[in-house]
């Protein structure tokens, strides 16, 4: 009987350690400890920076029924869907809305400019439409990683940075990015309640 209990105990410890080893690792860093996240009533979503993983591109080329390659627009849709599911307390503003507003007020269509020029004009004008903006960056190498950098729209200073690194079993797909977004909005809500 003692051996059986010992075996079950060791098995439970092994299963727990394996699940912990493959779990996603997340971290939030507050760059401005004095900034009150409760001041964010409108959060603008800048076009996510995303490049498909080499494995996803290879699968798409070789397999006829491979999943469709993810695009930044698909990620933006996931962001809004997750925010609605999580019932965030602030208004989200899409990059398309901001681009249209900038075009209407300045006459400049930033979607036709280089990334550097577009971001510069975006930063100069975003204060007219939102309290803060977030730039999502997705990296796909040996692990799937998502970064979310939140900036104050008034003076473009860095408020906080969120990073989540997927486990070894995570894949370059919308389900994982949706899970990452849920965690981001959840931790942003927790930070705003402090």
PLM regions: where:
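Positively charged n-region of N-terminal signal peptides that target proteins for export
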Residues: 1-7
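Well-ordered beta-strand positions
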Residues: 132-134
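Histidine- and/or cysteine-centered catalytic micro-motif in compact active-site loops
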Residues: 3, 48, 95-97, 139
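N-terminal segment of the mature soluble domain
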Residues: 54-118
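Bacterial N-terminal signal peptides
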Residues: 8-17
């Amino acid at each position: 009987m003692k051996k059986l209990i010992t075996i079950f105990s060791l098995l439970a410890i092994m299963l727990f350690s394996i699940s912990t080893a493959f779990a996603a690792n997340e971290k939030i860093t507050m760059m401005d400890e004095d900034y009150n996240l409760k001041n964010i009533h409108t959060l603008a979503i800048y076009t996510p920076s995303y490049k498909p993983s080499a494995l996803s591109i290879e699968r798409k080329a070789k397999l006829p029924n491979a999943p469709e390659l993810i695009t930044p627009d698909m990620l933006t849709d996931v962001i809004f869907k997750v925010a609605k599911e999580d019932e965030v307390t602030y208004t989200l503003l899409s990059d398309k809305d901001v681009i249209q507003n900038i075009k209407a007020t300045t006459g400049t269509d930033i979607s036709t400019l280089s990334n550097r020029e577009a971001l510069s004009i975006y930063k100069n004008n975003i204060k007219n439409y939102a309290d803060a903006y977030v730039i999502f960056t997705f990296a796909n190498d040996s692990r799937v990683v998502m970064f979310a950098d939140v900036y104050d729209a008034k003076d473009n200073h860095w408020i906080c940075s969120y990073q989540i690194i997927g486990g070894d079993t995570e894949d370059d797909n919308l389900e994982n990015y949706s899970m990452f977004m849920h965690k981001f909005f959840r931790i942003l809500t927790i930070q705003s309640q402090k």
